[in-house]
Amino acid sequence: MRTSKYLLSTLKETPNDAQVVSHQLMLRAGMIRPLASGLYNWLPTGLRVLKKVENIVREEMNKSGAIEVEMPVVQPAELWQESQRWEQYGPELLRFVDRGNRDFVLGPTHEEVITDLVHREVSSYKQLPLNLYQIQTKFRDEVRPRFGVMRGREFLMKDAYSFHTSKECLQNTYDVMYRTYNNIFTRLGLDFRAVQADTGSIGGSASHEFQVLAKSGEDDIVFSSNSDYAANIELAEAVAIGQRQAPSATMELVDTPNAKTINDLVEQFNLSVEKTVKTLIVKGANEGQPLIALIVRGDHELNEVKAQKLPEVADPLEFANEDEIKTKIGASIGSLGPVNLPIPAIIDRSVALMSDFSTGANIDGKHYFNVNWDRDVALPKVADLRNVVEGDPSPDGKGTLQIKRGIEVGHIFQLGTKYSEAMKATVQGEDGRPQTMIMGCYGIGVSRVVAATIEQCHDEKGIIWSSDEIAPFTVAIIPMNMYKSKNVQIFAEELYQSLLNKNVDVIFDDRKERPGVMFADMELIGVPHMIVIGEKNLEKGEIEYKNRRTGEKQIIAKEQVLDFLAQRVNA
């Protein structure tokens, strides 16, 4: 590709409304341009990268035995009503009515459509297992689109769905998809982690997220220093070690009129925050127990996903308001605790090991100091309630936990029969009777992968693509003052044609621009290999090679340039 025939569209200045690095660089590199909130045009440079990522995903999915299909973006409401997600999904599901007054949606995902399709096409257990995928545009009406294509309303996604007659068969395909995703993100050259995750609104049993490590990530991911253990912070198990110490002081009721928070209490009474507990009141799952107390250590945070999974707690999790708490307990938030508490309590594992701790007295303006389990208050139910913190022991007993920010780029689920049961998707089983199909689903945000890669791989000059395979161009030819030197022009043209003949993805900067502008643009868009052709070097039979990723510079004989590049491109 010649730059004189190409829409390069780079920008010198960073747009003011771009908050994260990937959004800034995708705009500056001429990869995308905004159309409306959360909607973007993909310009040639961006589309080249997007298509290359898409091709890697497609190649690895095909290797896994999955079969590509394509389904409509527009979906009839009846399917969503049949699966019962019409009411559940919320306002991010864009609904509309056609001229025949029929309800439709713009698909944010395709569980309903694929279940309906397979139900119609597959009739016998002999046709299973089956894993179908598509790479297609999705739409979710995000309440606050931000960060460019990282969280846009329209995005490109690879979504796959597998169908089985047994859990063992599902597990086999799930394991294949797990390995396939690892292959995809390894091939993309990304630093990533596969982490245990919550199934969320999709539903099902087992689930893993694939997270690209990046400081700008929206998720906290947890992994062990000495093992393969990794989990989303929502699911990471918090281990409590040690034993409860014997009481060393008598419980004391203390006036604390100005201590409304744990920080107030710690500062005013010179307490260790590790010796305090906080009591949070949530709605109960049973009418007989409308409120439940959840108690964690003062320096820990309640994990709402873990709390919501407790059978005693209402789903979705809902905190009680001040009036409800005051009416039932007789004290305000900030003065609550387990002693003489008139509602059931569940305490975190770490709280169960505490002794001589301080807590609200369920009397406004008062706290108990030196509280001990069994002696002063019966030990309630114990559960894992908190978020892990850096340095916690790993649940597998190997090493300690580290926490980093991550960008979710892939998610795999074992759905079970959530959709097939609701939509009566059955096949004839081996015994001749109808059998509900068991499902898995596997998603990759293809356009999000592009942004996540840039978040992880960039410098002050621009993008550094993590793999030659996804760079918009793998080689750039930069001729210095080409229009003033016949020798430079001739060699640059010959090299360009030679690289094209070898199917190298090359960009030839044949603009009448200063060399500094050419270098800046090629570094900005992240071309990994640059060949610099100058009159003085050519007179010595040499050209200069620059590596965008390592910063390496090397003078090589011009006759060796093709062999030299062959050893480095995609290496």
UniProtKB/Swiss-Prot annotation:
Q: Mind telling me which CDD domains this protein's record contains?
A: ProRS-INS, ProRS_anticodon_short, ProRS_core_prok
Q: Which compartments does it reside in?
A: Cytoplasm
Reactions accelerated catalytically: tRNA(Pro) + L-proline + ATP = L-prolyl-tRNA(Pro) + AMP + diphosphate
Sorted alphabetically, the Gene Ontology BP terms of this entry are:
prolyl-tRNA aminoacylation
- What are the recorded GO MF terms, alphabetically? aminoacyl-tRNA deacylase activity; ATP binding; proline-tRNA ligase activity
Keyword set, alphabetical order = Aminoacyl-tRNA synthetase, ATP-binding, Cytoplasm, Ligase, Nucleotide-binding, Protein biosynthesis
Q: Which InterPro entries match?
A: aa-tRNA-synt_IIb, aa-tRNA-synth_II, aa-tRNA-synth_II/BPL/LPL, Anticodon-bd, Anticodon-bd_dom_sf, Pro-tRNA-ligase_IIa, Pro-tRNA-synth_IIa_bac-type, Pro-tRNA-Synthase_IIa_type1
Keyword Ligase, does the record have it? Answer: yes
Q: What is this protein called?
A: Proline--tRNA ligase
